Amino acid sequence: MKHSVQRVIDIDAESGPVGLLANIDMIETKGEDQVIFHLKTPDATFPYKLATPAAGIVPKAQYPAKAARKGFQVDGSGPYTMKPEVEDGRVVRIAFEKNPSYKGELKVLNDKVEMDLFPDTGAMGKALDEKKIHLMTRAMSPEQAHEMLVSPKEGVDLTELPGLAISYLGFNTKDPVVTKPVRQAMAQIIDRGQIAGKVYGTTAEPLYSLIPSSIAGHTNAFFNKYGEPSTAKAAKILDKAGVETPVKFTLHYTSDHYGPATAEEFKAIQQQLNASGLFKVSVRGEEWSTYRPEQKRGDYAAYGMGWFPDFPDPDNYTAPFLDANNFLNSPYRSREAEKVLIPQSRRAADRTAAADAYEKLQDIVADDVPVLPIWQGKQYVASRDGIAGVERSVSATSELQLWELNRPNA
Protein backbone atom coordinates (compact mmCIF):
# COMPACT_ATOMS: atom_id res chain seq x y z
CA MET A 1 0.00 0.00 0.00
CA LYS A 2 2.83 2.40 0.79
CA HIS A 3 4.21 1.93 -2.72
CA SER A 4 0.80 2.52 -4.30
CA VAL A 5 0.06 5.77 -2.47
CA GLN A 6 3.62 7.13 -2.50
CA ARG A 7 3.91 6.70 -6.28
CA VAL A 8 0.80 8.84 -6.85
CA ILE A 9 2.40 11.57 -4.74
CA ASP A 10 5.81 11.25 -6.42
CA ILE A 11 4.50 11.14 -9.99
CA ASP A 12 2.32 14.20 -9.27
CA ALA A 13 0.49 13.91 -12.61
CA GLU A 14 -1.03 17.17 -13.80
CA SER A 15 -4.44 15.59 -14.35
CA GLY A 16 -4.10 12.97 -11.63
CA PRO A 17 -5.68 12.58 -8.18
CA VAL A 18 -2.66 13.72 -6.15
CA GLY A 19 -4.69 16.56 -4.62
CA LEU A 20 -6.60 14.00 -2.54
CA LEU A 21 -3.33 12.92 -0.95
CA ALA A 22 -1.77 16.37 -0.50
CA ASN A 23 -2.22 16.29 3.29
CA ILE A 24 0.04 13.25 3.71
CA ASP A 25 3.32 14.18 5.41
CA MET A 26 4.88 10.72 5.65
CA ILE A 27 3.98 7.06 5.13
CA GLU A 28 5.55 4.26 7.15
CA THR A 29 4.95 0.55 7.51
CA LYS A 30 4.88 -1.52 10.67
CA GLY A 31 5.27 -5.24 10.23
CA GLU A 32 3.63 -6.95 7.27
CA ASP A 33 0.07 -5.76 7.76
CA GLN A 34 0.14 -2.16 9.02
CA VAL A 35 0.54 1.14 7.18
CA ILE A 36 0.74 4.38 9.16
CA PHE A 37 -0.11 7.72 7.54
CA HIS A 38 1.22 10.88 9.16
CA LEU A 39 -0.86 13.91 8.13
CA LYS A 40 0.21 17.54 7.97
CA THR A 41 -3.05 18.64 9.60
CA PRO A 42 -6.01 16.78 11.17
CA ASP A 43 -8.44 15.52 8.53
CA ALA A 44 -11.60 13.57 9.36
CA THR A 45 -12.20 13.04 5.63
CA PHE A 46 -8.92 11.17 5.11
CA PRO A 47 -10.52 7.69 5.36
CA TYR A 48 -12.86 8.71 2.51
CA LYS A 49 -9.86 9.71 0.42
CA LEU A 50 -8.14 6.38 1.05
CA ALA A 51 -11.27 4.67 -0.29
CA THR A 52 -10.98 6.43 -3.67
CA PRO A 53 -9.04 5.11 -6.69
CA ALA A 54 -6.25 7.55 -5.76
CA ALA A 55 -5.19 5.07 -3.07
CA GLY A 56 -5.91 1.89 -5.02
CA ILE A 57 -3.39 -0.87 -4.31
CA VAL A 58 -1.26 -1.85 -7.33
CA PRO A 59 1.62 -4.35 -7.66
CA LYS A 60 5.19 -3.01 -7.70
CA ALA A 61 6.20 -5.29 -10.55
CA GLN A 62 3.79 -3.65 -13.01
CA TYR A 63 3.66 -0.09 -11.64
CA PRO A 64 6.99 1.80 -11.42
CA ALA A 65 7.49 4.10 -8.44
CA LYS A 66 8.33 7.26 -10.37
CA ALA A 67 6.45 6.93 -13.67
CA ALA A 68 3.04 6.06 -15.05
CA ARG A 69 2.60 2.58 -16.46
CA LYS A 70 2.66 2.50 -20.25
CA GLY A 71 -0.17 1.06 -22.30
CA PHE A 72 -3.75 0.25 -21.34
CA GLN A 73 -3.42 -2.89 -19.22
CA VAL A 74 -4.48 -2.59 -15.58
CA ASP A 75 -3.62 -4.84 -12.63
CA GLY A 76 -4.91 -4.45 -9.12
CA SER A 77 -6.72 -6.04 -6.21
CA GLY A 78 -10.32 -5.32 -7.20
CA PRO A 79 -13.28 -7.58 -7.98
CA TYR A 80 -12.44 -7.86 -11.70
CA THR A 81 -9.56 -8.50 -14.03
CA MET A 82 -9.51 -6.22 -17.06
CA LYS A 83 -8.66 -6.88 -20.70
CA PRO A 84 -8.76 -3.86 -23.05
CA GLU A 85 -9.30 -4.08 -26.81
CA VAL A 86 -7.31 -1.39 -28.62
CA GLU A 87 -7.76 -0.03 -32.14
CA ASP A 88 -5.55 2.73 -33.57
CA GLY A 89 -4.12 3.51 -30.16
CA ARG A 90 -7.57 3.90 -28.56
CA VAL A 91 -9.50 1.57 -26.25
CA VAL A 92 -12.77 0.56 -27.92
CA ARG A 93 -13.90 -2.27 -25.63
CA ILE A 94 -13.02 -3.58 -22.17
CA ALA A 95 -13.77 -7.05 -20.84
CA PHE A 96 -14.13 -7.30 -17.05
CA GLU A 97 -13.97 -10.85 -15.69
CA LYS A 98 -14.55 -11.91 -12.10
CA ASN A 99 -11.23 -11.90 -10.25
CA PRO A 100 -10.68 -15.33 -8.62
CA SER A 101 -8.08 -13.76 -6.30
CA TYR A 102 -10.35 -11.00 -5.00
CA LYS A 103 -10.55 -10.96 -1.19
CA GLY A 104 -12.68 -7.87 -0.60
CA GLU A 105 -16.16 -7.49 0.83
CA LEU A 106 -18.04 -6.83 -2.42
CA LYS A 107 -20.40 -9.53 -3.60
CA VAL A 108 -19.87 -9.91 -7.35
CA LEU A 109 -23.15 -10.95 -8.98
CA ASN A 110 -21.81 -11.70 -12.46
CA ASP A 111 -18.88 -13.51 -14.05
CA LYS A 112 -18.18 -11.08 -16.88
CA VAL A 113 -19.15 -7.60 -18.07
CA GLU A 114 -18.14 -6.15 -21.43
CA MET A 115 -17.96 -2.38 -21.84
CA ASP A 116 -18.12 -0.79 -25.29
CA LEU A 117 -16.90 2.78 -25.77
CA PHE A 118 -18.73 4.97 -28.30
CA PRO A 119 -17.73 8.20 -30.07
CA ASP A 120 -21.01 9.93 -29.17
CA THR A 121 -24.36 9.48 -27.44
CA GLY A 122 -26.16 8.89 -30.73
CA ALA A 123 -24.05 5.84 -31.53
CA MET A 124 -24.53 4.52 -28.01
CA GLY A 125 -28.31 4.97 -28.15
CA LYS A 126 -28.44 3.25 -31.55
CA ALA A 127 -26.54 0.27 -30.14
CA LEU A 128 -29.07 -0.01 -27.30
CA ASP A 129 -32.01 0.18 -29.72
CA GLU A 130 -30.44 -2.53 -31.88
CA LYS A 131 -29.86 -4.75 -28.83
CA LYS A 132 -26.09 -4.69 -29.32
CA ILE A 133 -25.67 -3.49 -25.74
CA HIS A 134 -27.81 -4.04 -22.65
CA LEU A 135 -27.19 -0.84 -20.71
CA MET A 136 -25.99 2.75 -21.21
CA THR A 137 -25.19 5.57 -18.79
CA ARG A 138 -23.01 8.61 -17.97
CA ALA A 139 -22.96 10.39 -21.36
CA MET A 140 -26.66 10.04 -22.10
CA SER A 141 -27.93 13.28 -23.64
CA PRO A 142 -30.81 15.27 -22.09
CA GLU A 143 -32.81 14.64 -25.26
CA GLN A 144 -32.37 10.87 -24.94
CA ALA A 145 -33.41 10.86 -21.28
CA HIS A 146 -36.41 13.11 -21.98
CA GLU A 147 -37.56 10.95 -24.89
CA MET A 148 -37.38 7.79 -22.78
CA LEU A 149 -39.30 9.47 -19.96
CA VAL A 150 -42.06 10.82 -22.22
CA SER A 151 -42.25 7.91 -24.66
CA PRO A 152 -40.84 4.77 -23.04
CA LYS A 153 -39.42 2.28 -25.52
CA GLU A 154 -40.58 -1.30 -25.47
CA GLY A 155 -38.06 -3.51 -23.72
CA VAL A 156 -36.06 -0.57 -22.31
CA ASP A 157 -36.22 0.74 -18.74
CA LEU A 158 -34.98 4.16 -17.64
CA THR A 159 -33.75 4.35 -14.05
CA GLU A 160 -33.18 7.69 -12.30
CA LEU A 161 -30.38 7.72 -9.72
CA PRO A 162 -29.14 10.38 -7.29
CA GLY A 163 -26.52 12.59 -8.91
CA LEU A 164 -23.81 14.71 -7.33
CA ALA A 165 -22.23 16.19 -10.47
CA ILE A 166 -22.23 19.98 -10.77
CA SER A 167 -21.60 22.48 -13.56
CA TYR A 168 -20.13 25.92 -12.95
CA LEU A 169 -18.26 28.86 -14.44
CA GLY A 170 -14.68 29.47 -13.38
CA PHE A 171 -12.66 32.67 -13.64
CA ASN A 172 -9.07 33.81 -13.87
CA THR A 173 -9.49 36.25 -11.00
CA LYS A 174 -6.30 38.10 -12.03
CA ASP A 175 -7.76 38.95 -15.43
CA PRO A 176 -8.40 42.72 -15.64
CA VAL A 177 -11.83 42.27 -17.25
CA VAL A 178 -13.60 39.74 -15.01
CA THR A 179 -13.12 41.67 -11.77
CA LYS A 180 -15.14 40.92 -8.64
CA PRO A 181 -17.94 43.40 -9.54
CA VAL A 182 -18.16 41.87 -13.03
CA ARG A 183 -18.40 38.37 -11.58
CA GLN A 184 -21.04 39.53 -9.10
CA ALA A 185 -23.03 41.12 -11.92
CA MET A 186 -22.94 37.83 -13.83
CA ALA A 187 -24.20 36.03 -10.72
CA GLN A 188 -27.02 38.59 -10.55
CA ILE A 189 -28.08 38.14 -14.19
CA ILE A 190 -27.76 34.43 -14.96
CA ASP A 191 -31.07 32.57 -14.74
CA ARG A 192 -30.12 29.06 -13.65
CA GLY A 193 -33.68 27.80 -13.76
CA GLN A 194 -34.05 28.75 -17.40
CA ILE A 195 -30.76 27.09 -18.32
CA ALA A 196 -31.54 23.88 -16.43
CA GLY A 197 -35.08 23.69 -17.80
CA LYS A 198 -34.45 24.78 -21.38
CA VAL A 199 -31.20 22.93 -22.01
CA TYR A 200 -31.28 19.92 -19.69
CA GLY A 201 -34.95 19.37 -18.92
CA THR A 202 -35.47 16.79 -16.20
CA THR A 203 -31.77 15.86 -16.04
CA ALA A 204 -30.64 18.97 -14.11
CA GLU A 205 -31.81 21.49 -11.56
CA PRO A 206 -30.55 24.98 -10.60
CA LEU A 207 -27.60 25.17 -8.22
CA TYR A 208 -26.95 28.11 -5.90
CA SER A 209 -23.83 26.85 -4.16
CA LEU A 210 -20.71 24.81 -4.83
CA ILE A 211 -22.18 22.18 -2.50
CA PRO A 212 -25.22 20.50 -4.10
CA SER A 213 -28.52 20.28 -2.27
CA SER A 214 -28.19 16.52 -1.71
CA ILE A 215 -25.02 16.96 0.39
CA ALA A 216 -25.17 17.82 4.11
CA GLY A 217 -24.09 21.39 4.78
CA HIS A 218 -25.61 22.83 1.59
CA THR A 219 -26.99 26.37 1.66
CA ASN A 220 -28.47 28.44 -1.17
CA ALA A 221 -25.69 31.00 -0.70
CA PHE A 222 -25.96 32.61 -4.15
CA PHE A 223 -29.75 32.88 -3.99
CA ASN A 224 -29.53 34.31 -0.48
CA LYS A 225 -27.17 37.03 -1.71
CA TYR A 226 -28.54 37.80 -5.19
CA GLY A 227 -32.14 36.60 -5.19
CA GLU A 228 -33.95 36.33 -8.51
CA PRO A 229 -32.12 37.35 -11.72
CA SER A 230 -32.14 41.15 -12.06
CA THR A 231 -30.54 43.33 -14.72
CA ALA A 232 -31.25 46.44 -12.64
CA LYS A 233 -29.35 45.10 -9.63
CA ALA A 234 -26.47 43.99 -11.86
CA ALA A 235 -26.30 47.48 -13.38
CA LYS A 236 -26.04 49.00 -9.90
CA ILE A 237 -23.14 46.67 -9.02
CA LEU A 238 -21.21 47.67 -12.14
CA ASP A 239 -22.06 51.36 -11.85
CA LYS A 240 -20.96 51.52 -8.22
CA ALA A 241 -17.60 49.95 -9.17
CA GLY A 242 -17.15 52.30 -12.14
CA VAL A 243 -17.12 49.45 -14.65
CA GLU A 244 -17.66 50.55 -18.25
CA THR A 245 -20.37 48.64 -20.07
CA PRO A 246 -20.89 46.57 -22.06
CA VAL A 247 -18.23 44.32 -20.52
CA LYS A 248 -16.52 42.36 -23.31
CA PHE A 249 -14.87 38.96 -22.96
CA THR A 250 -14.94 35.41 -24.36
CA LEU A 251 -16.59 32.60 -22.42
CA HIS A 252 -14.86 29.29 -23.15
CA TYR A 253 -16.22 25.76 -22.90
CA THR A 254 -15.07 22.27 -23.80
CA SER A 255 -16.86 20.87 -26.83
CA ASP A 256 -16.26 17.16 -26.25
CA HIS A 257 -15.92 16.41 -22.52
CA TYR A 258 -19.23 16.87 -20.72
CA GLY A 259 -21.76 15.84 -23.33
CA PRO A 260 -23.57 17.20 -26.38
CA ALA A 261 -25.67 19.81 -24.51
CA THR A 262 -22.69 21.91 -23.38
CA ALA A 263 -22.67 24.11 -26.49
CA GLU A 264 -26.38 24.87 -26.08
CA GLU A 265 -25.86 25.68 -22.39
CA PHE A 266 -23.17 28.24 -23.14
CA LYS A 267 -25.19 29.76 -25.93
CA ALA A 268 -27.99 30.25 -23.38
CA ILE A 269 -25.61 31.88 -20.89
CA GLN A 270 -24.31 34.17 -23.65
CA GLN A 271 -27.84 35.18 -24.61
CA GLN A 272 -28.79 35.98 -21.02
CA LEU A 273 -25.72 38.13 -20.40
CA ASN A 274 -25.90 39.97 -23.72
CA ALA A 275 -29.66 40.55 -23.46
CA SER A 276 -29.01 42.61 -20.32
CA GLY A 277 -27.11 45.18 -22.37
CA LEU A 278 -24.39 45.12 -19.71
CA PHE A 279 -22.28 42.48 -21.43
CA LYS A 280 -21.02 41.68 -24.89
CA VAL A 281 -19.88 38.09 -24.52
CA SER A 282 -18.70 35.71 -27.22
CA VAL A 283 -18.43 31.96 -26.69
CA ARG A 284 -15.84 29.52 -27.97
CA GLY A 285 -15.56 25.74 -27.70
CA GLU A 286 -12.34 23.73 -27.67
CA GLU A 287 -11.58 20.03 -27.51
CA TRP A 288 -10.65 18.90 -24.00
CA SER A 289 -7.06 18.06 -24.99
CA THR A 290 -6.54 21.75 -25.81
CA TYR A 291 -9.03 23.23 -23.38
CA ARG A 292 -7.78 21.84 -20.08
CA PRO A 293 -4.09 22.86 -20.48
CA GLU A 294 -5.10 26.35 -21.62
CA GLN A 295 -7.54 26.71 -18.73
CA LYS A 296 -4.95 25.64 -16.16
CA ARG A 297 -2.40 28.00 -17.71
CA GLY A 298 -4.74 30.93 -17.12
CA ASP A 299 -5.42 31.65 -20.80
CA TYR A 300 -9.17 32.05 -20.25
CA ALA A 301 -10.82 34.94 -18.41
CA ALA A 302 -14.00 32.88 -17.97
CA TYR A 303 -14.72 29.24 -18.69
CA GLY A 304 -17.07 26.38 -17.97
CA MET A 305 -16.24 23.25 -16.01
CA GLY A 306 -17.95 20.28 -14.41
CA TRP A 307 -17.18 18.41 -11.23
CA PHE A 308 -17.77 14.78 -10.28
CA PRO A 309 -16.93 14.35 -6.58
CA ASP A 310 -14.42 11.78 -5.37
CA PHE A 311 -16.48 11.16 -2.23
CA PRO A 312 -19.85 12.52 -1.02
CA ASP A 313 -18.72 15.07 1.57
CA PRO A 314 -18.86 18.89 1.46
CA ASP A 315 -15.05 18.96 1.75
CA ASN A 316 -14.81 17.58 -1.78
CA TYR A 317 -16.87 20.50 -3.12
CA THR A 318 -14.90 23.23 -1.35
CA ALA A 319 -11.23 22.35 -0.79
CA PRO A 320 -10.53 21.39 -4.45
CA PHE A 321 -11.61 24.90 -5.47
CA LEU A 322 -10.43 27.04 -2.54
CA ASP A 323 -7.21 25.42 -1.30
CA ALA A 324 -3.77 26.62 -2.41
CA ASN A 325 -3.18 23.68 -4.79
CA ASN A 326 -6.68 23.84 -6.23
CA PHE A 327 -8.03 21.76 -9.09
CA LEU A 328 -8.47 24.79 -11.37
CA ASN A 329 -5.02 26.26 -10.71
CA SER A 330 -6.96 29.42 -9.89
CA PRO A 331 -5.06 32.46 -8.59
CA TYR A 332 -7.97 33.22 -6.24
CA ARG A 333 -7.05 33.19 -2.57
CA SER A 334 -9.17 33.57 0.54
CA ARG A 335 -7.04 33.45 3.66
CA GLU A 336 -10.10 32.79 5.82
CA ALA A 337 -11.14 29.85 3.66
CA GLU A 338 -7.69 28.38 3.21
CA LYS A 339 -6.16 28.92 6.64
CA VAL A 340 -9.17 28.86 8.96
CA LEU A 341 -12.39 27.34 7.63
CA ILE A 342 -11.12 24.36 5.61
CA PRO A 343 -8.79 23.15 8.41
CA GLN A 344 -11.58 23.77 10.94
CA SER A 345 -14.08 21.73 8.91
CA ARG A 346 -11.67 18.82 8.58
CA ARG A 347 -11.13 18.57 12.33
CA ALA A 348 -14.77 17.62 12.86
CA ALA A 349 -15.10 13.84 13.01
CA ASP A 350 -18.84 14.39 13.35
CA ARG A 351 -19.41 15.93 9.92
CA THR A 352 -22.58 17.71 11.05
CA ALA A 353 -20.40 19.71 13.45
CA ALA A 354 -18.65 21.25 10.42
CA ALA A 355 -21.88 22.85 9.14
CA ASP A 356 -21.01 26.36 10.37
CA ALA A 357 -17.64 26.29 8.60
CA TYR A 358 -19.25 25.15 5.36
CA GLU A 359 -21.93 27.82 5.59
CA LYS A 360 -19.21 30.47 5.86
CA LEU A 361 -17.26 28.93 2.97
CA GLN A 362 -20.34 29.05 0.75
CA ASP A 363 -20.97 32.68 1.71
CA ILE A 364 -17.37 33.57 0.79
CA VAL A 365 -17.80 31.97 -2.63
CA ALA A 366 -21.10 33.79 -3.21
CA ASP A 367 -19.50 37.13 -2.32
CA ASP A 368 -16.15 36.81 -4.14
CA VAL A 369 -17.48 34.61 -7.00
CA PRO A 370 -14.23 32.82 -7.91
CA VAL A 371 -16.60 30.22 -9.35
CA LEU A 372 -20.26 30.55 -10.31
CA PRO A 373 -22.43 27.41 -9.84
CA ILE A 374 -25.02 26.82 -12.59
CA TRP A 375 -26.71 23.43 -12.15
CA GLN A 376 -26.52 20.04 -10.49
CA GLY A 377 -27.28 16.93 -12.46
CA LYS A 378 -29.28 13.76 -12.13
CA GLN A 379 -28.08 10.40 -13.38
CA TYR A 380 -30.00 8.10 -15.67
CA VAL A 381 -29.31 4.53 -16.70
CA ALA A 382 -31.13 2.97 -19.65
CA SER A 383 -31.23 -0.82 -19.65
CA ARG A 384 -32.88 -3.58 -21.57
CA ASP A 385 -35.35 -5.91 -19.88
CA GLY A 386 -33.78 -8.78 -17.98
CA ILE A 387 -30.94 -6.81 -16.37
CA ALA A 388 -31.16 -6.57 -12.57
CA GLY A 389 -29.20 -4.40 -10.14
CA VAL A 390 -29.39 -1.33 -12.38
CA GLU A 391 -30.50 0.92 -9.50
CA ARG A 392 -27.19 0.12 -7.74
CA SER A 393 -24.94 0.08 -10.80
CA VAL A 394 -23.79 3.72 -10.56
CA SER A 395 -22.79 5.33 -7.27
CA ALA A 396 -23.77 8.83 -6.21
CA THR A 397 -20.28 9.93 -7.26
CA SER A 398 -20.87 8.51 -10.77
CA GLU A 399 -18.61 5.49 -10.33
CA LEU A 400 -19.68 2.31 -12.11
CA GLN A 401 -20.48 -0.56 -9.76
CA LEU A 402 -20.50 -3.34 -12.32
CA TRP A 403 -20.59 -6.07 -9.68
CA GLU A 404 -24.23 -5.20 -8.95
CA LEU A 405 -25.43 -6.13 -12.45
CA ASN A 406 -26.87 -9.57 -13.08
CA ARG A 407 -29.33 -11.51 -15.22
CA PRO A 408 -31.49 -13.49 -12.77
CA ASN A 409 -33.30 -15.46 -15.48
CA ALA A 410 -30.25 -16.24 -17.61
Regions found by a protein language model. Give the residues of each.
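Aromatic- and charge-enriched surface segment that lines or borders ligand/interaction sites
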Residues: 1-13, 36, 177
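Surface-exposed binding/hinge segments that line
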Residues: 16-62
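Gly/Pro-rich hinge or "lid" segments in bacterial periplasmic/extracellular proteins
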Residues: 51-107, 112
